[in-house]
Amino acid sequence: MEVEEFNNFSIEYTDKPFEGIFSHMYSKCGNKNPQACGLINILPSDKICNNASNVIIPNWKQHWFSFFGPNPFIIFDFQKLKISLSSYSLKTYSGNENYGHLQSWSVQGSNDGDNYSLINEQKENHDLNSCSAFKTYSFEKTEPFRYIKILMTGNNHAGSDFMVLRNVEFFGTLSL
């Protein structure tokens, strides 16, 4: 898979929350994880259940979760590419209401992996507080970033500090 074929590639959100950039990469990789194809590297704050890179596989039926601890995160490193993000979709796992679903988080972008700029922030949000809930968040397209971080900034709906995700999808434009 040549990264150049994704230069100036764009998918904007319409009404299909999990048919974005990762879904397209998955298809172009012959229905393989884009991380296995070398297109992206996914870096969790830690991993104890499954592989964090699976959150970008369309229709993944399991989930990734972090250890208990403050400010867990997952970073999407586009390596040779950069993304101008305009929307993202999150899907939580199959736990009941008021369990470990995200409640407060931020999405941040960086080009050096150290200094991050805020892209979107959700505080005390209840959109994902149910079994397999999903939601898409849209905003003005960002500058191009190599790294996108989803950082949990407060306790989840269970009042704990572990992060759980089933699926993540990004929309916007990729460039070299």
Regions found by a protein language model. Give the residues of each.
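Activation corresponds to long, low-complexity, non-globular regions
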Residues: 1-38, 176
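Eukaryotic beta-rich interaction modules
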Residues: 20-26, 31-75, 86-87
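A short glycine/threonine-centered beta-strand motif
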Residues: 78-80
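Trp- and acidic/polar-enriched beta-sheet ligand-binding modules for extracellular glycan
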Residues: 3-8, 44-47, 57-74, 94-176
